[in-house]
């Protein structure tokens, strides 16, 4: 599989700029039948997204994926979003009642535009069976399947009918899969993305390990169509979860999707809880991401996201931060 590296080991090399202002650069991306303002999607986690944020994102042309931790609310959520002319994008698991849920959607003629099959180890017969089940009953839904970390997994899920695959096993900030199990793409997520993208014939969503806005551009360079981000989206005014004050500073809770806080029990725990500094409004963060990505495109010598895909890069093994951690 060649060179192993992660986000902080890579620098992209500038090409001649062809724009007068970064505002001429277009950050939009198409996934399935819809076009979105940014190639970025907040993680489908309980401390990152709720109905209110999903609505805000959809109304403003950002992609979103609703989490699956209140399964009984999904049908009303789909109805509500579609009645307002917005896309419905939901998550499902692979347990037996999820099969019934998909059939119920079909029976009620409810077709979410996007369905994400979301389990920790997505290279499994359970996921393959669920992809086929959704494609049989809801053929118009765009199916994202994951999470995976190998080219074999990408190929198998695509062959089963997945419209996109989500790549990343445990690189997230509140994910401790790497510590608890010894497995995953933590520490080499960017190389894993590159490896998987070479095998893919359909879009890839890079999931986890993003610590700076520049990492979004690096993900695009190594084959991602969309980039899923947790920690950078945690801690906003609008974010779910409680706000606490400590030493005069405001913090918000952020926990992983397989943490005991989310599961309500200490069994098969692969997530942890942390408090992140309060970041102000979500809108400001999205605008900053867009502006930074416009700058990335201008450094890549183009006007569209695709220009980033062909730039040269170097592996800087001493880390680009030289010990100065920015996160």
Curated annotation (Swiss-Prot):
One Pfam family this chain carries? Answer: IMPDH
Please state what class of enzyme this protein is: oxidoreductase
Q: Which InterPro entries match?
A: Aldolase_TIM, Dihydroorotate_DH_CS, GMP_reductase, GuaC_type_2, IMP_DH/GMP_Rdtase_CS, IMP_DH_GMPRt
EC code(s) of this entry: 1.7.1.7
Per its database record, what is this protein's job?
Catalyzes the irreversible NADPH-dependent deamination of GMP to IMP. It functions in the conversion of nucleobase, nucleoside and nucleotide derivatives of G to A nucleotides, and in maintaining the intracellular balance of A and G nucleotides.
Q: One GO term of the cellular component aspect?
A: cytosol
Q: Where does NADP(+) bind?
A: 204-227
Q: What's the domain of life for this entry? A: Bacteria
- TM segment ranges: none
Gene encoding the protein: guaC
Q: Biological process GO annotation list?
A: 'de novo' pyrimidine nucleobase biosynthetic process; purine nucleotide metabolic process
Q: Can you tell me which family this protein belongs to?
A: Belongs to the IMPDH/GMPR family. GuaC type 2 subfamily.
Classification via Gene3D superfamilies: Aldolase class I
Assigned keywords, A-Z: NADP, Oxidoreductase
Reactions catalysed, semicolon-separated, are: IMP + NH4(+) + NADP(+) = GMP + NADPH + 2 H(+)
Please verify whether the record's keywords include Oxidoreductase.
yes
Supply the name of the protein: GMP reductase
Q: Where is the active site?
A: 175
